[in-house]
Design a protein with these regions (language model features):
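Short, surface-exposed polybasic-aromatic patches that bind anionic ligands, especially phosphate groups
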Residues: 1-227
Length: 227
């Protein structure tokens, strides 16, 4: 399972493991949380974030009444309530201290990478899950006027082009995307310029490849598709 946020995706620990249960409880996953089925092609459109990482030995979790800290023999590092909950769930001992006592200790980096907050998880009732241009997850309201995609494609529906096609630079080549949602490879940027579309959009290949592939177009064929 993966956690997809506005920043990208990160793998969650095995749900049957202690770490997996601790992480899910802390970030707000429960029996009512919807799990989205995501094919590998769409999953790869989300930016992969650094993996979650717990310290080999849980540090002591210290509460000053003004903040939470992880304390080791070398010093302290600030924690969020969510991170503290995870560490305690893995057996970290707790202690009370004062802000003055913590201020006297050195700041040290911790060998951990854990979510800093809980999340509000969305369901299909709230819209469609999409991958944004920067690799983050986006939920957009279901939109009227979309068309079902023909042929073999990971994406199911397409919208946004009422009339005419658009020239697209994927970073791996140039395409014309037709109003039907099919993508057609063209030879070069000059072909798009000759069509009058130019590069109307820059779309990462990881997203563009989710559309059904049409035949490669010559300049004459591309003129027909974009008209």
């Amino acid at each position: 399972q993966w956690l997809i946020t506005q920043h990208g995706r990160v793998a969650l620990p095995d749900p049957s493991s202690t770490q997996g249960r601790v992480v899910r409880r802390a970030i707000g996953v429960d029996d009512g949380t919807h799990t989205w089925p995501v094919p590998p092609e769409l999953l790869n459109a989300f930016a992969e974030l650094p993996p979650l990482n717990f310290p080999a030995q849980p540090p002591e979790v210290v509460d000053t009444g003004q903040g939470l800290w992880a304390r080791t023999p070398d010093g302290v590092a600030e924690l969020t309530p969510t991170q503290a909950q995870m560490l305690i769930g893995l057996g970290a001992k707790t202690a009370a201290s004062t802000a003055q006592e913590i201020a006297a200790l050195a700041d040290v980096p911790l060998n951990l990478n854990l979510p800093s907050t809980t999340f509000r998880f969305v369901s299909p009732d709230e819209g469609w899950m999409c991958a944004g241009n920067e690799g983050g997850g986006v939920v957009v309201p279901a939109q009227a006027g979309t068309v079902a995609l023909a042929g073999e494609a990971v994406a199911h529906r397409f919208g946004g082009l009422n009339t005419g096609g658009v020239g697209v630079d994927s970073g791996h080549g140039y395409h014309v995307v037709a109003p039907t949602g099919q993508r057609h490879e063209v030879k070069d940027k000059e072909t798009l310029e000759a069509l009058g579309t130019g590069v109307g959009a820059r779309v990462p290949w990881e997203i563009l490849r989710l559309l059904p592939e049409g035949s490669a177009l010559s300049r004459e064929q591309a003129l027909q598709v974009s008209s």
